Every structure is written in structure tokens, then in C-alpha cells.
Swiss-Prot record:
Catalytic activity: N-terminal L-glutamyl-[protein] + L-leucyl-tRNA(Leu) = N-terminal L-leucyl-L-glutamyl-[protein] + tRNA(Leu) + H(+); N-terminal L-aspartyl-[protein] + L-leucyl-tRNA(Leu) = N-terminal L-leucyl-L-aspartyl-[protein] + tRNA(Leu) + H(+)
Function, as annotated: Functions in the N-end rule pathway of protein degradation where it conjugates Leu from its aminoacyl-tRNA to the N-termini of proteins containing an N-terminal aspartate or glutamate.
Pfam families: ATE_C, ATE_N
Organism for this UniProt entry: Stenotrophomonas maltophilia (strain R551-3)
Lineage of producing organism: Bacteria, Pseudomonadati, Pseudomonadota, Gammaproteobacteria, Lysobacterales
Protein name stated in the entry: Aspartate/glutamate leucyltransferase
Sequence similarity: Belongs to the R-transferase family. Bpt subfamily.
GO molecular function: arginyl-tRNA--protein transferase activity; leucyl-tRNA--protein transferase activity
Predominant subcellular localization, coarse grouping: cytoplasm
Length: 251
């Protein structure tokens, strides 16, 4: 499949075969994938985000299932975002943390935290057997401008800070894309997933970026429903972005 244009300008898309859905065990899924060999992929990626695509490793994809449209791309309009009471409490609860933006490079401490997170939060989910190679292949693109937003508890009396969480974040001219967040399960009560998104919103605001892309909200899926708590929120219907409440009303 190709979006029209001459040979140099056309954008090639591939449709995958059916594969087990990563969200619903009783469903199959398929995706549209931008040509992974296209040398322009890094430049096309910001536009692809605005078309509802997402990155995993070096692949840029969008669900394209024959009998299910539950996955809805959502983004936060940074200038209009206002935290609710629960989100303000989460920010206050984590005021003691340091937030650092670091290069997206594989490190032993990062992988150790990632492995602990998967083992405790997603046991038997198909990812808990990831090794260092899978960690790097899944989260770090060879062409993407990716950063790790590290959340750390400061050390005292000469002790080093403690890594509590990492938000893998792509930086583009259209906004930030929240690729994946993992954290220390011993500190789950802090709400580090929520705190990470709040910090990504502030990061985008500082950089003058208009949106934070959260990936897919999935209708009826409990683990993905948290994304609707960030308001205002915009949803992509395959043609344009509109207010998320229109999606809830059945659009």
C-alpha cells in the first residue's frame, strides 16, 4: 500500500497478518506499519504521530483490525491541561523526587528496574522474559530522538540517589510521545505512572510543544482506562482529532 505521490515522495505502508492481540486474549489483531526501511522514517515520525501511529523499537505502527476498533489514539493538548485533585495530590506526594532527562542508552540499572517491573506487574504477560537485548530493541529506536525521564529519590549523607522509575519518551516537533513507563513495584503507592505523565506535560510546556501523545486508550480495557483521566483529552478517529468526550458518546 502506498500513499499517492511520485516514486520519491510516496509513503509505503505494510499491513501485517493477523496475530494474537496484546490486550484481549480472545481476539486477533493486525497493524499498518510504515516501511521500516524508509530512510525518511525519522522525519516522517512526527507526522505519523498526528495520524494515530505509535513507535515500538524501530517500527511505527497503527492498529488496523478487521472486526475491532477499540484502540483509539489519544493526546493531551498541553496548553489547556489542568490537573484534577487526584493528580495534584500525586504531584505533591512526589515532590521529594528528582527528575532527570538522560540519553536513551541501555544501562544495567535501567534493565534491572525494567525486569523487576515486568516480573511484578506483568507476570506471564509475554514480556517478563525480556533480556537486555529485548529491552533495548523494544524501547530504543535507531533513528528516534528518544530520552529517558528518570525519577530518583535523592541520596543522603553521601549516598547515591535511588532510581524509582523511568518514562521512555520520544521528542518530536509535534510533541512528546510517552512510549513506555516502568517503576519500582515497591513504590507503587507513589503513583509514579501518573507522576510521569504530569512531568511529561510540564516538560512539553517548557519546550513549547503542543501535545503529549499517550498511545491508545482502549474502550472497555481496565488497564488502559487511566488515560481518560487527563483532561482535556483529544482522540483520533482516523481522519481528525476531536474532543475525547465525543468518543465516549459513540463517535
Amino acid at each position: 500500500m502506498a500513499i499517492h505521490g511520485d516514486r520519491d515522495d510516496e509513503l509505503r505502508l505494510f499491513q501485517t497478518g493477523e496475530h494474537p492481540c496484546g490486550y484481549w486474549s480472545d481476539r486477533v489483531a493486525r497493524d499498518l506499519v510504515l516501511d521500516p526501511h524508509d530512510r525518511r522514517l525519522g522525519g516522517l515520525y512526527p507526522l505519523a504521530l498526528s495520524w494515530g501511529f505509535r513507535r515500538s523499537g524501530d517500527l511505527v505502527y497503527r492498529p488496523h483490525c478487521a472486526h475491532c476498533q477499540a484502540c483509539v489514539a489519544v493526546r493531551i493538548p498541553v496548553a489547556r491541561f489542568a490537573p484534577d485533585r487526584s493528580q495534584r495530590r500525586c504531584a505533591a506526594r512526589n515532590e521529594d523526587l528528582e527528575v532527570r532527562i538522560t540519553a536513551a542508552t541501555a544501562r544495567d540499572d535501567l534493565f534491572a528496574l525494567y525486569h523487576r517491573y515486568l516480573t511484578h506487574r506483568h507476570a506471564n504477560g509475554g514480556m517478563d522474559d525480556h533480556g537486555p537485548h529485548e529491552f533495548e530493541q523494544f524501547l530504543i529506536g535507531s533513528w528516534s530522538h528518544t530520552r529517558f525521564m528518570e525519577m530518583r529519590l535523592p541520596g543522603h549523607d553521601g549516598q547515591p540517589s535511588q532510581l524509582l522509575g523511568v518514562a521512555v519518551t520520544d521528542v518530536t516537533e509535534h510533541g512528546l510521545s510517552a512510549v513506555y513507563t516502568f517503576f519500582d513495584p515497591d513504590h507503587a503507592a507513589r503513583g509514579l505512572g501518573t507522576f510521569a505523565i504530569l512531568q511529561q506535560i510540564e516538560w512539553a510546556r517548557r519546550e513549547g510543544l503542543p501535545h503529549v501523545y499517550l498511545g491508545y486508550w482502549i474502550r472497555g480495557h481496565q488497564k488502559m482506562d487511566y488515560k481518560r483521566r487527563y483532561r482535556p483529552l483529544e482522540a483520533y478517529d482516523g481522519r481528525r482529532w476531536h474532543d475525547f468526550d465525543d468518543e465516549l458518546d459513540g463517535r
